[in-house]
Amino acid sequence: NFGRSKETLACFEKHMAGHHHGIAFDVYPYIASSTVLKNDSIQVAERVLITWSKSRPELAGRELSDIAEELNCDIYEAAAQLQPAGAIYFAMSEEDVQRILQHPNAMIGSDGLPHDEHPHPRLWGTFPRVLGHYCRDLKLFPLEEAVRRMTGYSAETFGLSKRGMLKQDFFADITIFDEDTVLDAADFECPTKPAKGIDCVLVN
């Protein structure tokens, strides 16, 4: 689906126009995904970064192409030798990410695999990356809209009562950050760096 976000969003909008209930979808601010190591994902990726390997744990954090060269085989044989394993796949377009982020029905969020030896930076960087890079620097949307897409909109969509807003009798889930300095520091080489500009996180 690389480069096809216009078609995808048009399909969503066509279905939304014919229904009383809105359709929401989630997006995260990266051009790479992360899951188990498998051939069909390798086939469509420009780059593959190994996050963990049970059989060869010392190779976590390295590019699959480099591992294949070292093992003197193709990338599929290298993948077979690493199994079971996980990987990050660079297979998305930055233009698509920005277009989807700007859509009013897009919720911002992420899952993650924190047990990986070399995890995806989304675990540490998703929300500050949106607030700092896409909202403040690229000005894709106002700060208030960015916060709403991460909090109230998601809570409303999934029916999470008393969540997602600063309101009397609601659970006090609060992040205190500096809008001028907030930014992700985690990247694919150092994925566990704490974000900048976040002073405090309060839960319940």
Language-model regions, residue ranges each:
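C-terminal cap of metal-dependent C-N hydrolases
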Residues: 99-105, 110-111, 126, 175-204
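Acidic, glycine-enriched loop/beta-strand segments at the rims
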Residues: 87-98, 141-147, 155-192
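Active-site neighborhoods of metal-dependent hydrolases
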Residues: 1-139
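Short capping/connector residues at structural and topological boundaries
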Residues: 53-55, 165, 187, 203
